[in-house]
Amino acid sequence: MNENEKKLLSDIECLPNVDCKCDFGDIVRAFADYKINDELKFKVRQIALNLRPWRKGPFEILETFIDSEWQSFMKFNLLKPFMDLQGKKVADIGCNNGYYLFRMSNLGAKKLIGFDPGVRTFLQFRFLEHFLKSGVIYELLGVENLPDYGEKFDSIFCLGVLYHRSDPVRALKELKSSLNSGGEVFLDTMFIDGDDEICLFPRLSYAKISNIYFLPTIRTLQNWCERAKFKDFEILAVKATDENEQRKTDWIYGQSLGDFLDPFDKTRTIEGYPAPKRVYVRVKI
């Protein structure tokens, strides 16, 4: 951690304990059924502002509404009908600040563990968990650390990660190695249309993001999963990303989806590639 991050962690750790009630709905909320003094409300808001950018959410903590860039409940609600987490050990790879894990915390899972190497998102999680007290565990680790983690899982969520990996088949193998017998992986990745066994590999960037590598056709994604020895490739949904789901707010810095697309043709990125579309799949071993 740098000095600013250490200061933020200290500020979070110095927050008083508050007897909160929680709501793990579309807006994940921590609130009190008694009057909270203005000094504490101000402190909570200032820490939340200092933790920007907030990519995933939304949250409301002691009357501070955190309007995140992504309306993450759209993705969660799309996947929820396919979730059966009762009594299971669950991992979320690339968990960001833990939004999806908080949403899962009332679905009966035995254990919920998030993996993400991002320090800023870890600090956001620590801030949220101070009030939510969900019991979710957060590890500052990535998908490459899974094989050596020492625990295996019944359900793994890997949402919006695969296109950031320069070796996606290896990442899939790392996910598979971390499953218990009969386990499942929920995947979400960007894709391109077509039936050919091909990928888009952006020259310099995709939607102004430099660490996006392979955008496969769905058939190619299935090939990757089969190469990693998964079976039962099940398409759950296909959805274009739009500005209802991802947009600029006061809780992020810089640009968002509207700035990443061609201003004259929203079906193309600023670089001229097809605009983002996502496929949601479940695979098993």
Swiss-Prot record:
GO MF assignments: transferase activity, transferring alkyl or aryl (other than methyl) groups
Keyword Transferase: yes
EC category name: transferase
Superkingdom in the source lineage: Bacteria
EC number: 2.5.1.-
Catalysed reactions listed for this entry: carboxy-S-adenosyl-L-methionine + 5-hydroxyuridine(34) in tRNA = 5-carboxymethoxyuridine(34) in tRNA + S-adenosyl-L-homocysteine + H(+)
Residues the record lists as binding carboxy-S-adenosyl-L-methionine: 56, 70, 75, 94, 143-144, 163, 278
Alphabetical list of InterPro entries matching this protein: CmoB (IPR010017), Mo5U34_MeTrfas-like (IPR027555), SAM-dependent_MTases_sf (IPR029063)
Pfam families tied to this protein: Methyltransf_9 (PF08003)
Keywords attached to this entry: Transferase, tRNA processing
A GO biological process held by the record: tRNA wobble uridine modification
SUPFAM superfamilies attached to this UniProt entry: S-adenosyl-L-methionine-dependent methyltransferases (SSF53335)
NCBIfam families assigned: PRK15068.1, tRNA 5-methoxyuridine(34)/uridine 5-oxyacetic acid(34) synthase CmoB
Function: Catalyzes carboxymethyl transfer from carboxy-S-adenosyl-L-methionine (Cx-SAM) to 5-hydroxyuridine (ho5U) to form 5-carboxymethoxyuridine (cmo5U) at position 34 in tRNAs.
Quaternary assembly: Homotetramer.
Family named by the database record: Belongs to the class I-like SAM-binding methyltransferase superfamily. CmoB family.
Protein's UniProt name: tRNA U34 carboxymethyltransferase
Organism: Campylobacter hominis (strain ATCC BAA-381 / DSM 21671 / CCUG 45161 / LMG 19568 / NCTC 13146 / CH001A)
Organism classification: Bacteria, Pseudomonadati, Campylobacterota, Epsilonproteobacteria, Campylobacterales
